[in-house]
Regions:
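Intracellular juxtamembrane helix-capping segments at the cytosolic ends
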Residues: 44-57, 246-260
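Loop-to-transmembrane helix entry/capping segments in MFS-fold secondary transporters
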Residues: 59-69, 166-167, 260-272
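Helix-to-loop junctions at the C-terminal end of transmembrane segments
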Residues: 1-4, 88, 183-195, 291-292
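Cytoplasmic helix-loop-helix junction between adjacent transmembrane helices
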Residues: 36-71
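C-terminal transmembrane helical hairpin of 12-TM major facilitator-type secondary transporters
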Residues: 197-249
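Intrinsic disorder in cytosolic terminal tails and internal cytosolic loops
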Residues: 117-124, 317-385
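Structural signature of the two symmetry-related core transmembrane helices
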Residues: 6-20, 99, 198-213, 304
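C-terminal membrane-cytosol helix-exit motif in multi-pass small-molecule transporters
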Residues: 84-85, 99-119, 310-318
Length: 385
């Protein structure tokens, strides 16, 4: 009703002011409400940005656009962790810095001369349809949402409780984002060659094993020769954990697409995102219970258990259902935060109906060519003489 630019500006402003309120009112319940507002704002911002990218992409460059988007998303996520070192997290300065960066994102959007696209209504599969199409896809997406939300939300809490310095916390969170982005492509290539369920099972059990190893190397770690106390080995095994764990959503999406027609790829992706979101709501709460019962290492115990759940369920599904070869389905790296609008950037989905450019319209209209909207198809234009 109000357009992309106004929606982006409104929710970016809301996100910016919500961050500042954190430093004004320090109360757990108020922060709980503020986090809800932040989540709503970020989903709306992502939806606007990804639908805009989708509208500006053609069938020839959708994959490239998605790859660049992935690099920017994970890269800035990793670099952003180092902002913790500008000031103590106990002070109000970090909140101001986040608010400033969020507000700065408005400048290029508000000054653009490009015409904003129209929103597309994307209907997600309901949970029953999604489960019938791919039980393993839906269940693993639900569990993985639980894993991911706990991982990104409580990693800093775990590191703080293990007496990591602020710089070391920044390094750990940076390694999580960057190694996860780098792992997308080799893991995806392997999944295009072998049964995706087998790749998912090996990845989940690999992540579970490295989570347990991380527990044993997280306290006193020494460089070869006993040079100095160091967290080098923890970083090393945490990178291996990220390599196994972070490509999971893209693998789950590709696996689900193996069992459905190309026309349903976007709807299935939206359904998986919904299942992922349901799991994500419970992740931090469940993980915090483990950390209360076991101590800080309950963080990795939680990750071990839920990765194992996915792995064992995958083994069960391989016994009751044969793999299929869908020529329309292939692995495409996708961030976990992607919205249904962004899923359309997946080059394996249906071709985008590309309307004539404004310049072509102007030239043809000079020659007596008239345009009219086709009543049977949304957003499609045809030429009539």
């Amino acid at each position: 009703r109000v357009g992309h630019i106004r929606v982006f500006a409104a929710f970016a402003s809301l996100a910016s002011l919500v961050v500042l309120i954190h430093s004004v009112i320090i109360h757990p319940f108020i922060w709980f409400l503020l986090r809800i507002l932040t989540g709503v704002s970020m989903v709306c911002i992502y939806t606007v940005a990804e639908s805009w990218l989708n509208d500006r992409s053609s069938n020839k460059n959708r994959g490239s656009v998605l790859s660049i988007y992935m690099v920017i998303l994970y890269g800035t996520m990793g670099i952003g962790m180092f902002l913790l070192n500008f000031s103590s997290p106990k002070n109000f300065q970090p909140f101001i810095l986040v608010s400033v960066i969020t507000s700065a994102a408005l400048i290029p959007i508000l000054l653009t001369k490009k015409k904003p696209p129209n929103f597309k209504k994307i209907q997600a599969m309901n949970m029953r349809e999604l489960y019938e199409a791919s039980p393993f896809g839906m269940v693993s997406s639900l569990f993985y949402g639980t894993i991911q939300s706990a991982l990104f939300t409580l990693l800093a809490v775990y590191a703080t409780s293990m007496n990591f310095t602020i710089l070391e916390i920044s390094i750990v969170t940076f390694l999580l984002a960057i190694s996860g982005a780098v792992a997308q492509f080799p893991v995806g290539k392997i999944s295009d060659i072998y049964d995706r369920r087998r790749v998912i099972v090996f990845s989940t059990f690999g992540a579970a094993i490295f989570a347990i190893i991380a527990i044993f190397v997280s306290r006193q770690m020494y460089l070869p020769g006993g040079l100095a106390t160091s967290k080098t080995w923890f970083y090393f095994f945490f990178i291996l954990f990220s390599f196994c764990s972070l490509p999971m959503f893209s693998l789950i999406l590709a696996h689900t697409n193996d069992y459905i027609s190309k026309e349903k790829f976007v709807a299935a992706g939206a359904g998986l995102q919904f299942a992922f979101g349901l799991g994500a709501m419970s992740g931090p709460f469940l993980c915090s219970i483990f950390m209360d019962l076991v101590g800080p290492n309950g963080f990795f115990v939680f990750l071990f258990i839920f990765h194992s759940f996915i792995g064992f369920f995958g083994i069960y599904r391989m016994k009751v259902r044969k793999t299929v070869e869908n020529p329309d389905s292939q692995f495409v790296a996708m961030p976990q935060t992607i919205t249904p609008a962004g899923i359309e950037l997946n080059p394996t989905t249906e071709h985008i109906e590309e309307p004539y450019s404004e310049k072509v319209k102007e030239i043809l209209e000079r020659k007596g060519v008239k345009y009219k909207k086709d009543e049977n198809e949304d957003q499609k234009e045809e030429v009539t003489y």
